[in-house]
Amino acid sequence: MVGLTGDDSAAVELVPSLMAFRAEPGLPDIQVRVEWTDELTPASGLQLFDSGALWRLYECEAGFQFDFRAPVFGDEPYKRLLVNRDFSRATLQMSAEVSGAFPYAAPLDYPVDELLIMHRLTQEKAIELHGCGIVRADGTGNLFVGHSGAGKSTTTRLWMEREDVEILSDDRIIVRRDEGCQDDRAQKQVPPLRFANGRNDKVFMRNDKPSTRNYNASIRNDKSNMRMYGTPWHGEAAYGSPGSARLGSIFVLEHGAGNVLTRLSASQAVAELFARSFVPFHRHEYVESALEFLQELVSAVPCYRYAFEPDGGAVERVLELCD
């Protein structure tokens, strides 16, 4: 859970894509305090990373400093995130000048929200993957991962045309160990993130809501203790749900002929998933944590390379495997 606090309603304003993830107040995993400042002084710490576009990362006394820039706001940072080393407490400083001239610059707009969660996941047994999560009517959860252009949005549309499915996201999925894997679906699952509001206004974002699909059917793979969660960060098909589902199978998408499925070895699966993950590469311990979790993931969930054609036969081939 991410708790967002501030002295007025503007401090906890959510962009539309986050509204479905709003939650009631509770004990946050990440507490963020929003402040407005007249001046964001130049960064003085060691630069750790430069995204080449929207943000730069520095070391600071508290832990880490993220400076965010955008051409429309000029050359200087328009917001700054100061966060401790375990990503549990942060201060988000907003330029009062920019906020006054551009009121649509909300505190948790992209990429602040995703960077917070991506880094927090390094402290837990969890990872964000570049993929689409599809939940069938019987509760079966399948994850289709792929680089940009590999066919995630196409896969989403093919499944929606074929049967009644729930799309958790068509571009970003979080996977974590299901701490309540033997419990009934109605049991509260441990979420990877949530965001909350009030005053000292708070806004939470959450995605711990189980899918509305039939849970009992989704536990046919008794070995799987992994769960996938929707996120607000969608692709061209624009699907982002706060739902979650037990993860049954993972498919690494690539364009091909004949809709060919090939079971991957554990080492192959780890390499393929790591190449399609969102991991902070600026610290070796974050990379090591991600690799350790991926090893656990592929030992629990079968992974396949899927060379597919963009037609209904691609769905039928997966159904043959899963049914």
Task: Map each language-model feature to its residues.
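Conserved glycine(s) of the Walker
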Residues: 150-152
